[in-house]
Amino acid sequence: MRTPLLRQLATLVRRVAADVPDTDGARNDAVDPMSRRSFVTTAAVTAAGVSLSSCTGATDITALPDLRAGESPPTARIAIVGGGLAGLTAAYRLKQRGIIATVYEANTRLGGRCWTNRSSFAGGQIAEHGGELIDQSHSSIRQLAQELGLTLDNVLSAEPNGSEPLYHFDGLAYSAAQVQQDLKAVWQPLKRDYVEAGYPTLYTSSTARGRALDATSIRTWIDQNVPGGSSSKLGQLLDVAYCIEYGAETTEQSALNLIYLLGAVGQGQVRLFGPSNEKYKVRGGNDLIVQRLAAALNGQIVTGKALQGVSATGDAWTLAFDDRSRIVADRVVLALPFSVLRERVSLSNSGFPATKMRAITELGMGQNAKLALQFRTRHWYTLGNSGDSFADTGYQATWEVTRAQPGTRGILVNYTGGSVTSQQSGRHPSALAQEFLARAEPVFPGLTAEHTGVASFDDWPRNQRALGSYAFYRVGQYQRFAGAEREMVGSCHFAGEHTSQDSQGYLEGAVESGVRAAREVSTALVG
């Protein structure tokens, strides 16, 4: 899950799955045409070019082709466009195989949406502008961090024992026990849809139920399957949870977004998927990964150079940049968000096939924002709360970002998505902080008095190098083009979280796709 809040829901669904008998005879692990885990493993071997170690679950970088003894490194001209985690990882893995690529980044700062805020808060506390949490199952980024000599902090173990999330709807607290009880009525249709849909739904492979669910919005699914529909407390909770999880109103999102996350939790599926727990952060900030990758790629990175056009030139590619320069490359890795590619780059002469162009021009991009506020104390602990909350009072959701950080102060992130983010966009952090505190006070009594006055705001939809937070599928998009995002076009490769089937929207998706792109390039050059 992209947010801690879906983790809480998944935990409750798992408890329900253990309590509710299997009345329809469907087995969670009987997913057709293939289980998610078998898909991940197959994709890792055949598409991403990585293998999963049976001992550690880590990406095996030795799966990348090595140069043969006495063989010279390839002389192909390789351009990687995008200096975020995906592009830098691809260049780093290629360099480990003796293949040198040049990375072109439009910004003067590397890292893209992996970016740590070290300047706003007192006491040396930090927050993440962008991607924040790393699952235990995110093997590619965990291995990369380890290789680079970085330490991962376990933020879950830093939570006080017995602390719980807070849910607040219709003017009243909505306890985890109540949520769990209400979920029991939803479990059977959720499980049935997951099994009948199969995983994954792609433009090349799908089931009848998968296509039907893809053509249905999350809001409609809630209205059809939750007692009381989207106006019930559980309906409101699911609506808010998925609005922030993907950064879009639930009326816009494919129901498969909900089915594949929550339907995968429960009897049988815990084995298949492993835990999803947002357990880790990089000690000192996630962008230390970026800094160390950049240091390892000294002399291979060009910043302040924005791509404006991609043209197929025989077997090569011509890239046009905003400084009016052009380069010709034998192989290209486009590690840019599709939101930027469609708005900032001319592809009229690229020769990209129709399905690829459909994915580039239509793929959803989340509208998420982060408002981070520092407090004198971690007041939420005194309320028996972990910092995680959902509410209908207007602020949507929170979590604590200072778990495993020293000091008595604490930072809460107010995380928003969809129309709430649109209403915040362009406003000053101090005004947003006052608005948040007024809306959060009924949920966290006494919180306002603890605010230090410090706040920062990350408005990703207005960030011109991202134009949003991370990718998601709108209604109907799984069957229209899912899977095409990562497909090569000749000697042009694609990387970024938006190209990752299993880790779309995660830092892991960026790293995993960079490994895959490096594999594709090295296989083509070395064999």
Task: Give the location of each predicted region.
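Conserved flavin/dinucleotide-binding core of flavoenzymes
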Residues: 7, 14, 42, 61-66, ...
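Central helical "cap/lid" subdomain
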Residues: 311-312, 321-382
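Active-site/ligand-binding neighborhood in enzyme catalytic cores
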Residues: 202-309, 314-316, 338-340, 345, ...
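N-terminal secretory signal peptides
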Residues: 1-34
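N-terminal secretory signal peptides and thylakoid transit peptides that target proteins
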Residues: 25-50
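Generic structural signal for small/hydrophobic residues in well-ordered secondary structure
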Residues: 85, 111, 145, 222, ...
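N-terminal glycine-rich phosphate/pyrophosphate-binding loop and immediately adjacent elements
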Residues: 70-199
